[in-house]
Amino acid sequence: MRLHHLLLALLFLVLSAGSGFTQGVRNFVTCRINRGFCVPIRCPGHRRQIGTCLGPRIKCCR
């Protein structure tokens, strides 16, 4: 039963973070939801930056 509570809390966290997507991606969870990945350098190849992960130096690329 505790697992259900944890998953419900995680769902609320993800949904509340996704509601402000007009401001861009700002954490790992929303980066992954938006089919991105986090890198500590600039985005490789033809990928573009769609936000940041865990601070301004780690980019979310898609």
From Swiss-Prot:
GO terms for cellular component: extracellular space. Disulfide bonds join C31-C60, C38-C53, C43-C61. Keywords: Antibiotic, Antimicrobial, Defensin, Disulfide bond, Pyrrolidone carboxylic acid, Secreted, Signal. InterPro entries: Beta/alpha-defensin_C, Defensin_beta-like. It is found in: Secreted. The keyword Secreted applies. Residues 1-22 form the signal peptide. One of its GO terms (biological process) is defense response to bacterium. Transmembrane segments: none annotated. GO terms for molecular function: CCR6 chemokine receptor binding; chemoattractant activity. SUPFAM superfamilies: Defensin-like. The modification Pyrrolidone carboxylic acid is found at Q23. Neutrophilic granules. Belongs to the beta-defensin family. Has bactericidal activity. Active against E.coli ML35 and S.aureus 502A. This is Beta-defensin 7. The gene is DEFB7.
